[in-house]
Amino acid sequence: MPSPIALLAAATERIERVDAEALLLHALDCDRAWLFTHGDIPLAAAATESFQALVEQRARGIPVAYLIGRRGFWTLDVIVSSATLIPRAETETLVEQALQRLDHASERRVADLGTGSGAIALAIACERPQAQVLATDNSAAALDIAARNASAHGLNHVVFREGNWYEALLGERFDLIVSNPPYIAVTDPHLTQGDLRFEPPSALISGGDGLDALRILAAGAPAHLRPGGWLVLEHGWDQGAAVRTLLHTAGLVAVATMQDLEARDRVTVGRCPGF
């Protein structure tokens, strides 16, 4: 029977080592400490076959997060499935900007539109437990995953509601609306590359220029924000100027774009006047 070290060596001829390690930890249901203190022990046939099947799927391009059913985001371990977008590190910039606009003391109302796995809403709820957080999505399958994540992290005060963008808010107003909407143009060649090939198109593609959902979110914000409330949006690295224009056109003030850790435009914010 092969050892973990031997399996890793063979797998890294086909896939990246970091991916191989993640898949082996999943197949063995162990942590890295166990793996590297027991790297030379023979493994059972079932574990070996399970790992090799995962490697085969990864070699075909299937994302590691979908193969193991989880992805780390913020301080959370988030369940994901093919019904949800895979949370990405750059989206933590969106969470940071939202948190900067939510104080610790008061019960602010927050809406996360297009929540997917619930990663953004749950990260905010974890850091601001006094906030009233509503998370919406037009996918019932995604909301099921999001609700499972809330339960797993004891964040059962987060409310989930099915509906498309502002329709799900039922005319309510919020102190902060946050969203990581689809923002890739339908003709973008990146859609045929990497993990994007396997993620739900509805969570990625937004019209001919990638701005359709962002237009809806910008235009509808004043009717759903309380005076002084913030709209916080993620977008593509080359869309900052266009999104600022959308927010200005909608009548928001204090409009600004923030960069992610790779120094790329990633998040644009605007405030509802009247505060």
Swiss-Prot record:
The gene is prmC. It is an enzyme of class 2 (transferase). Methylates the class 1 translation termination release factors RF1/PrfA and RF2/PrfB on the glutamine residue of the universally conserved GGQ motif. GO terms for molecular function: nucleic acid binding; protein-(glutamine-N5) methyltransferase activity; protein-glutamine N-methyltransferase activity. SUPFAM superfamilies: S-adenosyl-L-methionine-dependent methyltransferases. It catalyses: L-glutaminyl-[peptide chain release factor] + S-adenosyl-L-methionine = N(5)-methyl-L-glutaminyl-[peptide chain release factor] + S-adenosyl-L-homocysteine + H(+). One of its GO terms (biological process) is methylation. Its EC number is 2.1.1.297. InterPro entries: DNA_methylase_N6_adenine_CS, HemK-like, N5-glutamine_MTase, PrmC_N, RF_methyltr_PrmC, SAM-dependent_MTases_sf, Small_mtfrase_dom. It comes from the Bacteria. This is Release factor glutamine methyltransferase. Substrate binds at residues 180-183. Belongs to the protein N5-glutamine methyltransferase family. PrmC subfamily. Keywords: Methyltransferase, S-adenosyl-L-methionine, Transferase. PANTHER family: HEMK METHYLTRANSFERASE, MTRF1L RELEASE FACTOR GLUTAMINE METHYLTRANSFERASE. S-adenosyl-L-methionine binds at residues 114-118, 137, 165, 180.
